[in-house]
Amino acid sequence: MIVDKLLDDSRGGEGLLDAAGDCGLMTSPLNLAYFYGASPPSAPGAGDTGYLSAVPSAPGSPGSDSSDFSSTSSVSSCGAVESRPRGGARAERPQVEPHMGVGRQQRGPFQGVRVKNSVKELLLHIRSNKQKASGQPVDEFKTQSVNIEQLTDLKSAVSAVGKRKGPDPLSDGPVCKRPALLPSHFVTSPQTPTPGESMEDVRHSESKLDSSAALLQNIINIKNECNPVSLNTVQVSWMSPTVPQNSPRDQCQDFHGGQAFSPPQKYQPFQVSGSPQMMDQASMYQYSPQTQNMQQPPPLPPQQQHQQNYPHNSPLQFSPYSRMSQSPKYDSNLFDTHEPQFCTGQSFVSLLTGPGEPESLAVPVPAPTSIPPQTETQLQTFSLMPSNACEAVVGVHDVGSHSLGTSLSLQNIMGSPMNTTQLGKSFFQWQVEQEESKLANIPQDQFLARDGDGDTFLHIAVAQGRRALSYVLARKMNALHMLDIKEHNGQSAFQVAVAANQHLIVQDLVNLGAQVNTTDCWGRTPLHVCAEKGHSQVLQAIQKGAVRSNQFVDLEATNYDGLTPLHCAVVAHNAVVHELQRNRQSHSPEVQDLLLRNKSLVDTIKCLIQMGAAVEAKDRKSGRTALHLAAEEANLELIRLFLELPSCLSFVNAKAYNGNTALHVAASLQYRVTQLDAVRLLMRKGADPSTRNLENEQPVHLVPDGPVGEQIRRILKGKSIQQRAPPY
């Protein structure tokens, strides 16, 4: 409606176009205060400007038609008739504003900024140039208005680039005179048009391709003015010979029609202060943008490695290899691997010699043959550089001092006087050698000498726990076949070691051939001594030594009292239990010692059972089993241990020579705290309360009087078990 009024009241449509051209509102940002309706009313006498100022123009987008028409209608009252070129719009602006009656007023609050569209101006400029060149009159109003036709050139250019039928011209010159800027693999091969397309369409699109490419190149140049380089991207100039390292501004290069590539972070130059080879690691790599795959080529001969020159600051070269291929000039990174590889002997020698000299040390160091493999591992730790690093520094001649120091240190270590026979030996073996050197000049008859008790040097050494001396003496006496010589109590050195709880010496003596079933003057074997004293470790040493020396261990051997080692162990444990029941002070040192002895005896009994000792074995005098002996003291721990065995039913009702079972023995006890529990445990495990002895007595007949006796009788008669309730 406003446009119609302006056309009726003003001097005509041409004046409107001229006014728009004079003010130049479409080619420059609008006056913000006047655009948002914040300007003061026009001065009186300005014609129709008062009406125009009273009607606020709605704000629109920078490319909207409403803003163009509103600005055009606002400027129509300027009164300018003659049309001026677009370049002079800003120059004539101060002369137009006084006629508008606006002047420079104080603007309202800032509400936004209208950014000029560079792409839109470029399209309008190109369109106006083409119309001037063709001789057609330039229509300023149609040029500045926003229509869909303005984007047709851009759309055609994009579509032509997306569906080109031949090589894409990327420069403004003729096609026949353009230089080839891209490699052959970047250029798309010509395609044959499909049957649906005609040759005329192809020629028509090729005719427009030149102007469209120039338009697209201008748009790309405008977009690249802001240098859109991200923090994670490094643009490499593939055309320039050198790339400065400390100029990030120069790294942003325009590659026409291509893409900026940067090597991966893993293969960036490693900046260290050292040899030039390490400082110029970037020159040792060639990066392939297609594959991004780096592999190590096969190593070169040493002569070629000396003659090969690595240029400094060499430019990055593009090598179009396939995905599975590798570059023949690629050298692996010295710091690529995290696991250090030891240099071989050949590469280590090459550090000490020149390129033309033979790879041999100046001072030959003979490698001793008697050195165990441990020394080789120690000597390999001199070079922690990778193998390729050792080969890389061969051509450097300033490493002579380091090589000399390394060779001297190697010579000192290799040539130092050391006793190689002592390497890898334990302290015990060293002690044996020392004792042998001490006893080298002693005659053999001195080893068989005895004191007043009949003890030899071996007996005394074993009793003192001197293992190395005992081993040397036992080896010398074994050569004389006098290893089992006994003292006045009939104990051999082996039995003395068992009594002294020297399990290591026991194992050495058994390995040398000591008899494990020998007896003393009391008829005790070494197993009896272990069982009485609770030496479980000595028992295990005897078992291991007997297996190695192929000896038989008699577990059922009896002493002069007719007791087996298991019987002796049970009797010793009963004594400890009795002492614990008598002593009420649980924190006294005596009780602590008793507890330790109790534990050691239980371990010994378990070890004997594990070795194969029979629980049902009877003693020679009374015919009692180990269960009978445990029931005599109401030893709940041992009774439970024996009754938990799989073969408990074979000895739970075993009778002694007087016909008593273990239940008879437990029921007849007096003044025992654990008597009631022992009887109950035997009854639960299958003991028969109806069994009679040789005097025709049952266990219930042997129960003493008293409150505890009454409870035992009830248990034996089965009255302690609650009767079942009738089902009805």
UniProtKB/Swiss-Prot annotation:
Effect of gene disruption?
Mice have splenocytes with defective proliferation in response to LPS but not to anti-CD40, IL-4 and anti-IgM. Though mice grew normally after birth, some of them started to develop atopic dermatitis-like skin lesions with acanthosis and lichenoid changes at the age of 4-5 weeks. All mice developed the disease by the age of 10 weeks. 5-week-old mice show pathological changes in the conjunctiva, including a heavy lymphocyte infiltration into the submucosa and loss of goblet cells in the conjunctival epithelium.
The entry lists its GO molecular-function terms as: POU domain binding; RNA polymerase II cis-regulatory region sequence-specific DNA binding; transcription coregulator activity
State the Pfam families in the record. Ank_2
Name any Gene Ontology BP term.
positive regulation of transcription by RNA polymerase II
Locate the region Interaction with NFKB1/p50: 414-728
**ANK repeat windows:** 453-482, 489-518, 522-551, 561-589, 591-617, 622-651, 658-691
Question: SUPFAM superfamilies from the entry?
Answer: Ankyrin repeat
Describe, as the record does, how this protein assembles with itself and its partners.
Interacts with NFKB1/p50. Interacts with RELA. Interacts with AKIRIN2.
Protein name from the UniProt record: NF-kappa-B inhibitor zeta
Q: Which organism is it from?
A: Mus musculus
